[in-house]
Swiss-Prot record:
Cellular localisation: Cytoplasmic granule
Keywords carried by this UniProt record: Amidation, Antibiotic, Antimicrobial, Chitin-binding, Disulfide bond, Fungicide, Signal
Name of this chain's protein: Penaeidin-2b
GO cellular component annotations of the record: cytoplasm
Pfam families per the UniProt record, alphabetical: Penaeidin
Record carries keyword Signal: yes
Residues of the signal peptide: 1-21
Residues modified to Lysine amide: K71
Function of the molecule: Antibacterial and antifungal activity. Presents chitin-binding activity.
The family this protein is said to belong to: Belongs to the penaeidin family.
Organism: Penaeus vannamei (Whiteleg shrimp)
Keyword Disulfide bond attached: yes
Example of a GO biological process term: killing of cells of another organism
GO molecular function: chitin binding
Length: 72
């Protein structure tokens, strides 16, 4: 009996939360920020030949890789 009461409570709570989400204008997951302006990740720094000078500079400062492109 307690299990049934618990399941009914959880189902009603989920319906209320779903209704609040739509009423508040929230329709989906929060989008990720664009990659522009984000620091390059370590795997990007491993492929030095594909980097721009600014990305190579960031890789050199943060991770110590691709520094030969900056000194170039």
């Amino acid at each position: 009996m307690r299990l049934v009461v618990c399941l009914v409570f959880l189902a009603s709570f989920a319906l209320v939360c779903q209704g609040e989400a739509y009423r508040g204008g929230y329709t989906g997951p929060i989008p990720r920020p664009p990659p522009i302006g984000r620091p390059p990740l370590r795997p990007v720094c491993n492929a030095c030949y594909r980097l721009s000078v600014s990305d190579a500079r960031n890789c050199c400062i943060k991770f110590g890789s691709c520094c030969h492109l900056v000194k170039g």
